[in-house]
Amino acid sequence: MSDGKSVEKEEALSVNEHLKTDSDFLRGTIQEGLDTAVTGSFSEGDQQLIKFHGFYQQDDRDLRNERKEQKLEPLYSFMLRARVAGGVCSPEQWLGVDEISSTLTSSNSIRLTTRQTFQYHGISKRNLRTLIQGLDSKALDSIAACGDVNRNVMCNPNPVESRLHEQAYYWAKQLSDQYLPRTKAYAEIWLGDDKVATSEGDDVEPVYGKTYLPRKFKMAVAVPPDNDVDVYTNDLGFVAVAEEGELVGFNLVAGGGMGSTHGEVQTFPRLADDFGFIKAEDTLKFAEAVLKVQRDWGNRSNRKLSRLKYTIVKYGYEAFKAEVEKRAGVKFEPKRDVVIGDRGDRYGWIKGVDNKWHLTLFIEGGRIKDLPGQPLQTGLREIAKIHKGDFRMTSNQNFIIASVAEEDKAEIEALARSHGLMGKLITETRGRSIACVALPTCALAMAEAERYFPDFLSKVESLQEKHGFLDQGIVIRMTGCPNGCARPFAAEIGLVGKAPGRYNLYLGASFEGTRLNKLYRENIQEAEILSELDSLFARYVAEREEGETFGNFTVRIGAVSAVIDAAKDFHEQHNHA
C-alpha cells in the first residue's frame, strides 16, 4: 500500500511490524488472553497489540522483589487511556468516568494527562471488558489512545475566544474521528459485536493499511497566542490563523517529538518545522498527506528511529514538503504571522466573549483523588451533578469548568473551595510545571517523577523566593525516563530520570516552547541540582536583561548553547560558563 516511495526495505522489519501484519487487524490472540485466568498478563505479542486498544500492561514495581521472593508472578495491572479529542467532555460523561475509577481500579483515582485526556491505573485483566463497556455507555472509548496510529488530538481550550475555540475544536474533532483505525477488532473484543469477515488492508484500513504507522503519531491544534498544547513538540501541528475573530486556516508544522534514548546520539528530541499556511477547508487533505508520507517513508526497521521527525531529517525538508503537496493536491501558501506566547493555563475565573464564565482549577500532578483535607474527586463529582456547561482537560494536567452562567458561579465556586479545588496559592512556576507518572507503575521509568515533583518544586520555589523572583514563572518539567511524556526537553528547566534519585539537568528552552533545551549536568542528585539552580538564579537576578526569561538567559550567558538544528547540535558537547 503506497502512494510513493515504499516502506524501508534495506533492513529487516522490526518484530512489531510482523506482529501488526499477522494480527488480523489488531485482533491477535487478545480474546484468548482475556479468557485465560491462570495469569494476570497477556502474551508478549498481545502486549503490543493492546496498546492500539488504549491500554498498557504494567506491574507494581514497588512490590516486584517481594512477590519474587514469594514465588508469585508480578502484580500485573493495566493503565487505560481514553480518547477525548481536545479534552472536552460533558458532566454526565464525567460522572461515568468518576464511577469507573471508584469501582474498577485499584488506584481509586483519575489521572489527567499531558495530552488532554484521562487515564486509569490499577485495572485488573478481569475488569478490562467491564471498564471499556462502561466508557462506551457514556459515548467514550480508548481506541487509538496508544499504539502506532494517530493518538489523542489536542486543542487549546481557550476559555476567552469562545467562537474561535469552537472552530478550532471542530477541526481537532475531525482530525480525531477521520484517522481512527477502521478495524472492528475493538468492538468485537470489548463490546461483544459479531466478528466481521476481514479483507485486504486497503478496504479495512484505507489510510493505515494492515501495518498501520511505523510509530505513534501526535497532532495538536493551537490557538495563538496560547501555546498550552506545545504545538511544536507534535508530529503534526495546526496553528490557528484568525481574521476578525474567525478561523481562516492554519500554519502547518510537522516533525516534532520528545522521545530519545539515553546514550544513543542518533535519537534526539526535535521541534516541528514550519511548512506554510493552509486554508481551513484543506486541513484533512494535508493531514492525510502527511500521515501517508510517514506511513510509506517512515523507518520500520528500528523503532527508535521511526517517528516522523527522523523521516523528515532523513529525506530532507524540501523533499518531504514536495511529497506532501503532491499527495494533498494543494500547495502550501507562505506562513502567516502569528504570535506564539504563554504555555500556562489561566487559573481562576475567566469571562469569555459569550459572557459565560470558565473556571480553571489547578490539579497537582493531574491526579484527581480524594486526599486528606482535599477531597478533589468528590468535589468534581458534586460539581458535575449541577454543572450545565462542559468540562475541559488541559495539556498542563488541569481541569476547566467551562461555560458557567453568571447565576451559577457562586454555587460552583463554593463547591470548589469546600473540596480543596480552590483557595491554595499556586506560584507562577508551579502553575506551569508538569511531571509524568513514572514509578511505581510505568515500566520505562528510571526515577521518580509525579510522586517526587511537588516536593522538589517547593525547594525550587524557596530558591526563587531567596533570590526575590518568586512572582516570575519558570517552565519546569520532570520525567522518569527520556521518552518525554511531560515534554521535558521543551522546558526551561528539564529533569530527566537516569537512575533512582538521579537526573539529567537540561537548560535553555524558550519560555514559549519554540526552542529546545540542552544537557547542562548529567546524572546528578537533588542536592547538586538545587546547588546548580541556586548559583544560576543568583546570576539571573544580577545579570538579566529587561524582560529576559530564565531559559533565554541561560543561553545568553553560555550555560548551554542554543539548539538550532536538533539532529546536529542537541547532543553537541558544550563547555559551561
From Swiss-Prot:
Transmembrane segments: none
Record: residues binding siroheme: C485
Cofactor(s) needed by this chain: siroheme; [4Fe-4S] cluster
A GO MF label: sulfite reductase (NADPH) activity
Superkingdom assignment: Bacteria
UniProt cross-references to PROSITE patterns, sorted A to Z: NIR_SIR
The encoding gene: cysI
Function recorded in the entry: Component of the sulfite reductase complex that catalyzes the 6-electron reduction of sulfite to sulfide. This is one of several activities required for the biosynthesis of L-cysteine from sulfate.
Pathway(s) per entry: Sulfur metabolism; hydrogen sulfide biosynthesis; hydrogen sulfide from sulfite (NADPH route): step 1/1
Residues given in the record as [4Fe-4S] cluster binding sites: C436, C442, C481, C485
UniProt source species: Shewanella woodyi (strain ATCC 51908 / MS32)
SUPFAM superfamilies (UniProt xref): Nitrite and sulphite reductase 4Fe-4S domain-like (SSF56014), Nitrite/Sulfite reductase N-terminal domain-like (SSF55124)
One Pfam entry name: NIR_SIR
Family of this protein: Belongs to the nitrite and sulfite reductase 4Fe-4S domain family.
EC number(s) per entry: 1.8.1.2
Paired cysteines (S-S): none
Name listed for the protein in its UniProt record: Sulfite reductase [NADPH] hemoprotein beta-component
Keywords: 4Fe-4S, Amino-acid biosynthesis, Cysteine biosynthesis, Heme, Iron, Iron-sulfur, Metal-binding, NADP, Oxidoreductase
Co-factor binding comment: Binds 1 siroheme per subunit. Binds 1 [4Fe-4S] cluster per subunit.
Gene Ontology BP annotations: cysteine biosynthetic process; hydrogen sulfide biosynthetic process; sulfate assimilation
GO cellular component: sulfite reductase complex (NADPH)
Enzyme class: oxidoreductase
